[in-house]
Amino acid sequence: VSRRVRVDYESGDRFRIAVRQHTLSVDQPASDGGEDTAPTPTELFIASLASCVALYARRFASRHGIRTDGLAVTADFSMASHPARVGEITLQLHVPGELSPEQQASLLAVTSHCTVHSTLMQPPEVRLELAALTPGAA
């Protein structure tokens, strides 16, 4: 099943993103020429990974009777160059309460298979195409 996300230019370095019935924005920090009205695309990319891990952790916790209040994921990342890209990501999963060593291993195994993490480990084919111009558009 193919799904679609649409990104439309707003102004400056700001773009509006439409996903199903949801709308969000991206921008650049003022130090990079933007207005800092929204996260950068790279920050959303990292947030996507962290939130995917968090979702899988929540589902695991619920299935195993582990508390979920206070469940959180923090993500630290650094950039690399040539080409510009995210070079390293470190995720820390904060789970309330004590987990046995077996639960810890199981939780890490489950969360490392979240959809976004799996996509990073097995990259999809990415095609960039130029859409046909609308007649009369400049």
How would you label these PLM feature ranges?
Residues 1-47, 55-138:
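Extended beta-strand/beta-hairpin segments
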